[in-house]
């Protein structure tokens, strides 16, 4: 039985990375340093732009985060690909929250636009995921649009984020 709360703490997310939140067959979030959120503040099966599900999560920003030390020296900025990966992480987390089983894999994205950046002076990144469709057949797949905000300002959008849950990834 999946623990279907509307919000999750950092410890809950770490438990997901250890395979403890959604059970042995459920999808896992990555462990630190690749876990790109500190908490999930809202998860619903309705709502969002398409009324088919919504997730909102946050990452606290501080200058000591690992990526600021190497991307780029003298010009620290959070890599845009980490924000994109966070959105994929949340799509997979939602599929597990719905009871889906399997190993999560990003399958693609239709379009990504960057209109801003995350600097070490920022306080918080917010991720918003708006589900468009859930396929629950042999392959469980989520299709969603996403937004990344820094200190409440929209800086990335992604259309048609796709994540699938696979029983066997050996041929993937």
From Swiss-Prot:
GO terms for biological process: unsaturated fatty acid biosynthetic process. Pfam families: FabA. One of its GO terms (cellular component) is cytoplasm. GO terms for molecular function: (3R)-hydroxyacyl-[acyl-carrier-protein] dehydratase activity; trans-2-decenoyl-acyl-carrier-protein isomerase activity. It is found in: Cytoplasm. SUPFAM superfamilies: Thioesterase/thiol ester dehydrase-isomerase (SSF54637). This is 3-hydroxydecanoyl-[acyl-carrier-protein] dehydratase. It comes from Klebsiella pneumoniae subsp. pneumoniae (strain ATCC 700721 / MGH 78578).
């Amino acid at each position: 039985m999946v623990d279907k709360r509307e919000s999750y703490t950092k410890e809950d997310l770490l438990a997901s990375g250890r395979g403890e939140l959604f059970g042995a067959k459920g999808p896992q979030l990555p462990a630190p340093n690749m876990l790109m959120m500190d908490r999930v503040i809202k998860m619903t099966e309705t709502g969002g732009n398409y009324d088919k599900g919504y997730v909102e999560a946050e990452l606290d920003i501080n200058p000591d985060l690992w990526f600021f030390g190497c991307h780029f020296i003298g010009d620290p900025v959070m890599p845009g690909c980490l924000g994109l990966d966070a959105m994929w992480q949340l799509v997979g987390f939602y599929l597990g929250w719905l009871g889906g089983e399997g190993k999560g894999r990003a399958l693609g994205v239709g379009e990504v636009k960057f209109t801003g950046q995350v600097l070490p002076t920022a306080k918080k990144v917010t991720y918003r995921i708006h589900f468009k469709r859930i396929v629950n057949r042999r392959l469980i797949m989520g299709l969603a649009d996403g937004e990344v905000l820094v200190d409440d300002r929209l800086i990335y959008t992604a259309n048609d984020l796709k994540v699938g849950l696979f029983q066997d990834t050996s041929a993937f």
